[in-house]
């Protein structure tokens, strides 16, 4: 495939650019991960599904991708929550990491190439801070905390397109007496009694949030890498501060391209615990199948806001079922690919090569689904070839990962075990020649949208 014509929006330049990796056919990508003080919410799902689609597409296009997604496992929020729960930070972190991995797996998010924890990279953070101090970009305050000297970095604000002087005038940053400037940010924080701490030249403490990502990306991807990704809420100050630290320390460009995913709104309002419209991924998955949630979150262009609402999720559910129904009762066979199948794949590539335009890519999938449905009764050979292509392109987006019949069995709140019990009762009723009861059970299930199919080997069921 042609590597030359992929374009996407670079937050650093503020415009779409042709993608040119540092090393031919290879991509080094860093995505800011979760601070594991609580359960992952729907905003996390949005971000990591967006970048999972991009990761999958890069691989589909033939790139060798190294994706680093970190875990922030030491932070003020983690310490505060552990104290509130009466548990150690280790207990809190390990439980939340397991929960994160569980929900990400349910949403079919691929594991990153590497998943470093902040606490595993302390020596590298200390080394970076020492370099910044030597170069005059950092200083130790009166209370021994170490701060980054923002005014020393001439390009501060280049990612967020903000002027440092204007930021200082409108600053709402809490005034800390030992700071030279209100915009200076902490690189190393001295530990209070009872808090987790690591030795450093400045005393026992822990790293600031921003230096963690700079050190982890440097360790695993080098001084300069291709793509840095994260939620749009991290653009300032987190990503701006990462650039300031890394470029001052390494004296070279930090990341060539910056991708930012759009935020989730709930019924057109900002998602917030105070507005009581905050949903964890687990809560959403209690109501909707992972296929539906993933489709919904992948169906909007990655950098646009997305509105979480029951109506939009129901629309996503209907769309998923349309795609699954097209693949029902047809075996995908690669060798049966029709000659004109390449036209569909080319349209899919054209959409995704243009800033990962998933809505346009999905439109291609629905055109394929329509073609399959038309051919099912007239040319199953050709339909099976199109079905193979539909499966292939769905895999690129990470959708339709569930067995078709298993998906339909889980729909509309139908309890599979209860259905199986009723089928067993119906089978026994037929053996006893109690056909009235057998018909009652069939009708009962039919009202729930469950279709029974009898054969010589027994009875199977599916959601209609």
Swiss-Prot record:
A motif ('HIGH' region) lies at residues 34-44. It holds the Pfam family tRNA-synt_1e. Its EC number is 6.1.1.16. Its cofactor is Zn(2+). Its main location: cytoplasm. Binds 1 zinc ion per subunit. It comes from the Bacteria. Zn(2+) binds at residues 32, 213, 238, 242. It is found in: Cytoplasm. Signal peptide: none annotated. A motif ('KMSKS' region) lies at residues 270-274. GO terms for molecular function: ATP binding; cysteine-tRNA ligase activity; zinc ion binding. GO terms for biological process: cysteinyl-tRNA aminoacylation. The keyword Cell membrane does not apply. It catalyses: tRNA(Cys) + L-cysteine + ATP = L-cysteinyl-tRNA(Cys) + AMP + diphosphate. Monomer. Belongs to the class-I aminoacyl-tRNA synthetase family. This is Cysteine--tRNA ligase. It comes from Francisella tularensis subsp. tularensis (strain SCHU S4 / Schu 4).
